[in-house]
Amino acid sequence: MEAPAAGLFLLLLLGTWAPAPGSASSEAPPLINEDVKRTVDLSSHLAKVTAEVVLAHLGGGSTSRATSFLLALEPELEARLAHLGVQVKGEDEEENNLEVRETKIKGKSGRFFTVKLPVALDPGAKISVIVETVYTHVLHPYPTQITQSEKQFVVFEGNHYFYSPYPTKTQTMRVKLASRNVESYTKLGNPTRSEDLLDYGPFRDVPAYSQDTFKVHYENNSPFLTITSMTRVIEVSHWGNIAVEENVDLKHTGAVLKGPFSRYDYQRQPDSGISSIRSFKTILPAAAQDVYYRDEIGNVSTSHLLILDDSVEMEIRPRFPLFGGWKTHYIVGYNLPSYEYLYNLGDQYALKMRFVDHVFDEQVIDSLTVKIILPEGAKNIEIDSPYEISRAPDELHYTYLDTFGRPVIVAYKKNLVEQHIQDIVVHYTFNKVLMLQEPLLVVAAFYILFFTVIIYVRLDFSITKDPAAEARMKVACITEQVLTLVNKRIGLYRHFDETVNRYKQSRDISTLNSGKKSLETEHKALTSEIALLQSRLKTEGSDLCDRVSEMQKLDAQVKELVLKSAVEAERLVAGKLKKDTYIENEKLISGKRQELVTKIDHILDAL
């Protein structure tokens, strides 16, 4: 029975194999998964799948050596892959991680990866490798809504078999759950259950690309905490400091809270809101200082900071516990000494920092944007990253004493987990002479300030003394006053005319006498002021003095006519003058008076 089975197995192998890029010959070496031990860790909100694979080169008449092999992802989970790593078993150093590159297989859909072997595999040889994959958002709450007092149950669907382009001789699967409370699970191969473990297999002679749905429904109250968006800003200064600030948007992606929230029950009953998140710990670099933690309202005083030998542990406690569907936003910032992360050789600089740092255990970051602000004048910027990242066009950042802006590297990546906490290296060139730019700008600014003050106190910025212009200004001012006084004097005449008209109607001689007295008094005062201004004009040597003198003579004649009109009115009232004669005389007086006023107006216009 052994020989026919082996022949059939080899036939399946040759029939399902597709050539891998980088093979030693045009015909792909026949490989087989001799033994696979899978561990599926579902104890958190991540699905961590670790497979210990014994890969064998069958030979089968082929003399070509295998320099690489293929990995395939399950179609149901491939879209949620966050991390894929392959390592030779027994070698724990990060430097011994095998090179993994995504590839395509003709005629096959899905995601495939080529893994380069450290040593070419001869026919009949074997190698043990460990394949580690981490998937996010594959544990779905069921029911999707729970009350504050209920526990959270989730459903996971995967594959009973190790999904591979190669046949597998034997394989087992161990599933680690978050609790012993299991509602249901698939029963393929009569699995054994012990506490929070499910053991499947062994499965023998499994063909390539085999699939059989594995499903488990169990209690999982671990924190389903997800960073939906995060912006990490790293500002580098050559004066000894690196400032780091992280803007974090958090969401509880577990079962949504149904019904009201009772803080009283939450504090009184230990199991109330068991799947909620009260606080979590963030690990900062050991050299972190000036740490701050705030949100939209302001500083959050419920946080705690613990300084350890190799790190700074920060307990972040939001203002309210996070239940399913609830969100929060906060900002964490700190400073680092640049000598621990910035290296240079002449004008060549290298910044070695983590692309993403620890935020909380079992972290998931849906979207991360990293902005690295380099000193002004940095050029020839290059980035070395341990994994693929995307870059947006570089930006410019302006701050104090900047002239043409600091270059900003903008990089982003989606779906990150703890395995992405690795260093990136930013290489750039910087002329050290530019370090003097800011001090020189400060010196120049103070120099200009002091020089301006010296000039200001030594120069006379008052209006230039021009005798002619000053005389003209004085004459204009005096003329303006003369015009005002003349207008007031003309107003007196009009007011006296109204008094005469009232006298003719009332025949009250006291009214007329009072009006005459008021006219004489005010006219005398105004005429005196005009005469004084006339003398000032004469002092200034202005030819306007003669015009004012002429206007004064004309005004005297106007006054005489005004008083004569009043006398005529008295004679009319006393019956000494006939009305016809009065009217005729009044016309003559008014005509002469109007002629004089017109002459005065012409003089005023000339002024």
From Swiss-Prot:
Regions crossing the membrane: 439-457
Cross-link (Glycyl lysine isopeptide (Lys-Gly) (interchain with G-Cter in SUMO2)): K538
Residues modified as N6-acetyllysine: K187, K538
Post-translational modification remark: Ubiquitinated by the ECS(ASB11) complex. Ubiquitinated by RNF128, leading to degradation in a proteasome/lysosome-dependent manner. Ufmylated by UFL1 in response to endoplasmic reticulum stress, promoting reticulophagy of endoplasmic reticulum sheets.
Lumenal side: 24-438
Membrane topology, from the record: Single-pass type I membrane protein
Subunit record text: Component of the oligosaccharyltransferase (OST) complex. OST exists in two different complex forms which contain common core subunits RPN1, RPN2, OST48, OST4, DAD1 and TMEM258, either STT3A or STT3B as catalytic subunits, and form-specific accessory subunits. STT3A complex assembly occurs through the formation of 3 subcomplexes. Subcomplex 1 contains RPN1 and TMEM258, subcomplex 2 contains the STT3A-specific subunits STT3A, DC2/OSTC, and KCP2 as well as the core subunit OST4, and subcomplex 3 contains RPN2, DAD1, and OST48.
Compartments where located: Endoplasmic reticulum membrane; Melanosome
Signal sequence bounds: 1-23
Entries under InterPro entries matching the protein: Ribophorin_I
Protein name: Dolichyl-diphosphooligosaccharide--protein glycosyltransferase subunit 1
Stated role: Subunit of the oligosaccharyl transferase (OST) complex that catalyzes the initial transfer of a defined glycan (Glc(3)Man(9)GlcNAc(2) in eukaryotes) from the lipid carrier dolichol-pyrophosphate to an asparagine residue within an Asn-X-Ser/Thr consensus motif in nascent polypeptide chains, the first step in protein N-glycosylation. N-glycosylation occurs cotranslationally and the complex associates with the Sec61 complex at the channel-forming translocon complex that mediates protein translocation across the endoplasmic reticulum (ER). All subunits are required for a maximal enzyme activity.
Glycosylated residues, chain numbering: N299
Family, per entry: Belongs to the OST1 family.
Higher taxonomy: Eukaryota, Metazoa, Chordata, Craniata, Vertebrata
Organism expressing this protein natively: Homo sapiens (Human)
PANTHER family: DOLICHYL-DIPHOSPHOOLIGOSACCHARIDE--PROTEIN GLYCOSYLTRANSFERASE SUBUNIT 1, RIBOPHORIN I
Cytoplasmic side: 458-607
Gene Ontology MF term list: RNA binding
Key word Acetylation present: yes
GO biological process, one term: protein N-linked glycosylation
